[in-house]
């Protein structure tokens, strides 16, 4: 099964709503929640870690994470939407934007996705984490 829809919008732009709608319409959708739900076996985390560290244009086995999906929205797929479009040239691209603009998107992101980093407990834990 090949990707038919590729999301180019970042998280906090309605991607979870789009993903829910696509799933209901029969388009199994890959979203950041898939990465988080698969972290126990690390297969998705390891794949995306490699993508982040490889030079752009490195050949990839996209089916390793997208097997069984017809759509991808949100992170991490939105960060490589151009590569995905090259791999799936018949796919359509969906761009989601925050309805109140870039500044509102930033505030929303800081208050949710990056909120743990601002907590003092997180700062203490980072001291205890091993460094690579």
Regions found by a protein language model. Name each.
Residues 3-6, 68-71, 92:
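Short active-site oxyanion
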């Amino acid at each position: 099964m090949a990707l038919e829809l590729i999301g180019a919008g970042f998280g906090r732009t309605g991607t979870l709503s789009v993903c829910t709608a696509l799933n209901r319409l029969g388009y199994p959708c890959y979203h950041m929640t898939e990465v988080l739900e698969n972290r126990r076996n690390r297969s998705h985390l390891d794949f995306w870690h490699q993508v982040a560290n490889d030079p752009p244009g490195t050949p990839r086995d996209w089916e390793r994470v997208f097997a069984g999906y017809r759509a991808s929205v949100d992170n991490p797929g939105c960060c490589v939407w151009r590569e995905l479009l090259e791999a799936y040239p018949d796919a359509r691209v969906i761009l989601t934007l925050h309805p109140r603009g870039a500044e509102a998107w930033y505030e929303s992101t800081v208050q949710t996705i990056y909120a743990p980093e601002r907590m003092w407990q997180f700062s203490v834990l980072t001291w205890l984490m091993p460094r690579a």
